[in-house]
Amino acid sequence: MISATVAELSESMAREDYVLSDGLAVSLFLALRKQRPLFLEGEAGVGKTEVAKTLAKLLDRRLIRLQCYEGLDINAAAYEWNYARQMMQIQSAGQGQLGNDDLFTLENLIERPLLEALRDDKKGAPILLIDELDRADEAFEAYLLEILSDWQITIPEFGTVAATAPPIVIITSNRTREIHDALKRRCFYHWVDYPSVQNELDILRRKAPEAGAALCEQVVRFVHRLRDESLFKAPGVAETIDWAQALVELDCVAIDPASADSTMGVLLKYQDDIARISGSEAARILTEVQTELSGFKAG
């Protein structure tokens, strides 16, 4: 059941270990209440995809994921015909014995994620995750417009398949290119930023409960300072969690310069970034973090 208030939605998502920012909570709530797609844009690793996954668990709905990539077409995204089965039918019936109505049937139709999402089940309409739309070609966006506008797909040989109840749609983009305005207008939009220190601490305590409170504080504040550096790719929330878990595996109860340097590849994924931060720069950031935490304790 969809939450009655924004606060209730935030609390429900938190019980599933997803911490919503205030802005994202409002956007998600409105998208659910108004049955509009939610377009989430932001850096990789900030938790956009997890919104759909967590929502599926919360509402006990099927999650249908369409992972976008360059060259994605209708056959992979929406439907295709079972040509092998059609050929067998033709061979069995004899040449010229079957017409289009005999061959282009529901039984010969192979459903891909977009078409599958238009079919609900006993649990209700599914959640459709269109992940990393910016990786797909612009032509694919045009195809999505009919679905997002009318909740239907037109199949030339078969007819129009319409949803009895619209799916819950979450679209994500890492903004490697701009998505066309025509598609954005059909959605509610939210930019997913890196979480605040307190929100990221909350996330880390939920996702890495084995890490002690002091270690979590160090990890989060170190990562936040790292994001202020001129890096090719700043670490996301996923990297924060991975780093805390890695440090626990190494029996670290606190970060020191040696452990920071030896595990930098968990946080950063480009050699130029690692080379720039490792050593004196990591030690400087760590000193700033320790000074900040000492100030909190003194206060």
Task: Report the location of each language-model feature.
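C-terminal regulatory/interaction module of P-loop NTP-utilizing enzymes
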Residues: 1-299
